[in-house]
Amino acid sequence: MGFTVALIQGDGIGPEIVSKSKRILAKINELYSLPIEYIEVEAGDRALARYGEALPKDSLKIIDKADIILKGPVGESAADVVVKLRQIYDMYANIRPAKSIPGIDTKYGNVDILIVRENTEDLYKGFEHIVSDGVAVGMKIITRFASERIAKVGLNFALRRRKKVTCVHKANVMRITDGLFAEACRSVLKGKVEYSEMYVDAAAANLVRNPQMFDVIVTENVYGDILSDEASQIAGSLGIAPSANIGDKKALFEPVHGAAFDIAGKNIGNPTAFLLSVSMMYERMYELSNDDRYIKASRALENAIYLVYKERKALTPDVGGNATTDDLINEIYNKLG
């Protein structure tokens, strides 16, 4: 089974890390005979300046026909690109791994957590308005359908990992909305994996105190946004964290970090988060096709990255090295065989 990928370079360091990473994508296609076609589309700040839209209609036409979206970091127009794409294609699951990389020292030891965040509801639904002068109201939307749906995603991941799920909420205060989310998680998860619940403030503290206690965390949109950034930093660095936005018909893969305009054009941007997002993309392709070539490609790319970090010979300044983007890309490329 082949795939068409809409490739968005993004802004800031995005065009550098994406364009320089293309040779790795091409090599993996060749090594594993992957039938993947990449089609570049414009989106983000540069598209906004050129066309008056961060997500131009012509780009949307290409994205609509593509199977998967792969993007670099987008600048100030990120909400007009990523949030809009999530809404258009109902990409309801935000998957954020927080996994230690060999060669990056942290005081937390080996961390391997997967945060499964509901991506379409909660306060981020955007239902807010001014009631009167000096008074604003935001509506928190939680439905049983979306809550059960994200719990099922968490279950599927947990069954392939350590079979442990923590549902994170704040039902002791938000008894109705968070209570509904917790009830939905219980109905899907209890009895099928090692299941527990934790209030979000306790989860934030326990991530710092003992991150090894977590395997898969299933949570709401706002809590997941905050906890996933915290977990990524605990695992080593927010700057090397990948992510996926997954729906039934479309998926988007992107680095967690921003566009880093301050280092754009200096050839020191770190492509690791983008490349780990590519590894996640191959994993998704395997799930959709059941073609072993994709999972082999995913593991090979991840292993190549880990080998380079373990040797610490070509790391960029953000992770304690003095190498360039090109240096790191070259080392990963060579490790692929």
Swiss-Prot record:
Record EC number: 1.1.1.85
A Pfam family recorded for this sequence: Iso_dh
A biological process from GO: tricarboxylic acid cycle
Free-text function comment from the UniProt entry: Catalyzes the oxidation of 3-carboxy-2-hydroxy-4-methylpentanoate (3-isopropylmalate) to 3-carboxy-4-methyl-2-oxopentanoate. The product decarboxylates to 4-methyl-2 oxopentanoate.
Keywords: Amino-acid biosynthesis, Branched-chain amino acid biosynthesis, Cytoplasm, Leucine biosynthesis, Magnesium, Manganese, Metal-binding, NAD, Oxidoreductase
Residues engaged in binding Mg(2+): D201, D225, D229
Record flagged with keyword DNA damage: no
Binding site for NAD(+): G258, A259, A260, F261, D262, I263, A264, G265, K266, N267, I268, G269, N270
Binding site for substrate: R86, R96, R117, D201
Keyword match Amino-acid biosynthesis: yes
UniProt source species: Sulfurisphaera tokodaii (strain DSM 16993 / JCM 10545 / NBRC 100140 / 7)
Protein name: 3-isopropylmalate dehydrogenase
Subunit structure: Homotetramer.
SMART domains registered for this protein in UniProt: Iso_dh
This protein's pathway: Amino-acid biosynthesis; L-leucine biosynthesis; L-leucine from 3-methyl-2-oxobutanoate: step 3/4
